[in-house]
């Protein structure tokens, strides 16, 4: 299904229903000589074409020959060549500047150059293809827009909402992996006012089809996603997706990935439930440090790189949309202008001057050629608008979404860093408190030993010590310090960190000065703090292991992601350059043909 062919674009053709050259669109004109092309123009065009091929060779290098893929997909040795799908190996065409893949076809100059899905960094359309999109009836008898996926000889139809639920499930199952984005949902008000219709919204469906195809192939390129059972079930027609969402591992996902193993969140250990939950909003990225400074530095640099990408791509996307609007307006003006020229060229039929008929015929023919040149400009501009959307606007929008997803993954690591920081700080405070209590206990022991020695030598000192002990015991009985409740294993004196509810039922005396505690309370608090330290040390080992897994997994994910960004950006620039050169070449050739005809007029 070609979005350009089946859209309402051809309704804008002012020559539809006539005998004009472009009555059926520019795609109806066969490759080769135009009906108004003379021999002189052929020679001139060959010279122009040779010069142009030399220029393209300097820009893009030599194109390698096509090669077949063992998986039956689209492959290419470089950006310059593209193969044919299985069963059509005889229809392989060199992918030069004038050839672009459209829906599994190789089209030549003068035909629609609108690919169904822009190639990846290797010039391939990927292992997964969405071969059809339209209305279908699901297993529950509901009618919806379905997208048929072809993969490894099997086909399965999924709805957009199922793609969305797949991505959400993958984001929760793989919090350390950058999950490729999908096209955004339409506003809810749009569905009330104008529900999506397979006949009237072909362009929207085709755009989603292209972007969802990119989503599937990007997921397939990532090993962690490709080998995950949920992704494999999504591509398997034997599974009903609504049932997959109600069965493990999706159904047993934790509500908070911070309280679960980062690489296997469906199997949390009891210690994970003891970890603190840092706040979602964070003000700075690099404040909490771990015991892996090289990873800290690397991910801080990645955060800066993603921010730069976002700042660069945002204005490019806005500019591409603006240019698309301008070219649409230009194409509309050219359509009107071409129609006027063609109508004016027919005036020779109403002019009856026998002695000047030859000059009038030549003049009408020249005017007609000018009109045809304007028509070529119009149709080429329409194709350029379509290519700007597919080859520039869509991939840049996808890259922006990708950058946002990368920053979300970095935010997850930041929260794990804060968990590490909270546990490390709490351990240090507990050890400091134990040391303080033990030092005070030792000082009291030394003081009591000195007083005991002096009391044996002086009865007056002994009576004074007994009186002070009685007063101190009376104050301790009135003091409510023993009734204080603690607020969690990781509670500090400032008390700003939320902790799990299971750790909020034990008494704490950490807010009381050590000199106000009795010997029994000090001993009890030391025993409690030592018990807490055992759990904290286990949590510390756990968070260290989690951070190591997070760092290694995210490093692999970002290695792929940064390469993807660089390759996609290079591919976008090259495809956009090819599109502009095609547009300029078509327009220039049409005007050269018109000029040759004009030069033959006898003045």
From Swiss-Prot:
Family under the similarity heading: Belongs to the sorting nexin family.
Role this protein plays: May be required for cytoplasm to vacuole transport (Cvt) and pexophagy.
Single Gene Ontology BP annotation: reticulophagy
Origin species: Eremothecium gossypii (strain ATCC 10895 / CBS 109.51 / FGSC 9923 / NRRL Y-1056)
SMART domains tied to this protein: PX
Stored Pfam families: PX
Keyword flag S-adenosyl-L-methionine: no
Name the record gives this protein: Sorting nexin-41
Region named Disordered: 1-36
Leader sequence residues: none
Gene: SNX41
Compartments in which it is found: Endosome membrane; Endomembrane system
Superkingdom in the source lineage: Eukaryota
PX domain boundaries: 121-241
InterPro entries membership: AH/BAR_dom_sf, PX_dom, PX_dom_sf, PX_Snx41/Atg20, Sorting_Nexin_Autophagy
Recorded GO CC terms: cytoplasmic side of endosome membrane; cytosol; phagophore assembly site
Binding site for a 1,2-diacyl-sn-glycero-3-phospho-(1D-myo-inositol-3-phosphate): 159, 161, 185, 208
